[in-house]
Amino acid sequence: MISAGDFRNGVTIEFEGNIYQIIEFQHVKPGKGAAFVRTKLKNIISGGVVEKTFRPTEKCPTAHIDRKDMQYLYADDDFYHFMDVETYDQIDLPKDEVGDALKFVKENEMCKVCSHKGNVFAVEPPLFVELTVTETEPGFKGDTATGATKPATVETGATVYVPLFVETDDVIKIDTRTGEYLSRV
């Protein structure tokens, strides 16, 4: 149990039958009346954000999230397949539950599979990946006045906007959280 007065960003709590991560909190002490804690909570399962107010003495149970390193094996029509590298157990996750989390991840790369009480709810890809550009338009001289970008398709099939000097077969570094080009490798 954690009291609202001890809330910090990143803490996961169970509240009203759901699991939430605290993304913002503020201790408020008005001139008149009792103090309170104003929070923004992100629902771990649905991704929705709600605002809730707690009394500082109010207690909530903490939610223990298991993040397990697993190897992304392959995808078929409906599922992504992962393997636990310690026990070699395999799990299948429906594509609609995983969403776009794996659009920059190649087969056989490591990911973190997040679960709560045995129920898998998310896959966290590595923060940065290095991928080969499979298709992009050539950049032309004189196009660089405003730091222009062009679309490029990488080996996983995802599209990234890259600077004009990036060419086909270049290896680039991508931030998987934002989908942005970081550098050429």
From Swiss-Prot:
Gene3D superfamilies assigned to the protein according to its UniProt record, in alphabetical order: 2.30.30.30, Nucleic acid-binding proteins
SMART domains, sorted: EFP, Elong-fact-P_C
Keywords: Cytoplasm, Elongation factor, Protein biosynthesis
GO biological process terms on file: peptide biosynthetic process
Function description: Involved in peptide bond synthesis. Stimulates efficient translation and peptide-bond synthesis on native or reconstituted 70S ribosomes in vitro. Probably functions indirectly by altering the affinity of the ribosome for aminoacyl-tRNA, thus increasing their reactivity as acceptors for peptidyl transferase.
Designated name of the protein: Elongation factor P
Entry's family note: Belongs to the elongation factor P family.
Source organism: Agathobacter rectalis (strain ATCC 33656 / DSM 3377 / JCM 17463 / KCTC 5835 / VPI 0990) (Eubacterium rectale)
GO cellular component: cytoplasm
Entry's Gene Ontology molecular function annotations: translation elongation factor activity
UniProt xrefs under Pfam families: EFP (PF01132), EFP_N (PF08207), Elong-fact-P_C (PF09285)
Main subcellular location: cytoplasm
InterPro entries in the cross-refs: Elong-fact-P_C, NA-bd_OB-fold, Rib_uL2_dom2, Transl_elong_fac_P/YeiP, Transl_elong_KOW-like, Transl_elong_P/YeiP_cen, Transl_elong_P/YeiP_CS, Transl_elongation_fac_P
Compartment list: Cytoplasm
SUPFAM superfamilies with a match to the protein in the record: Nucleic acid-binding proteins, Translation proteins SH3-like domain
Entry superkingdom: Bacteria
Pathway: Protein biosynthesis; polypeptide chain elongation
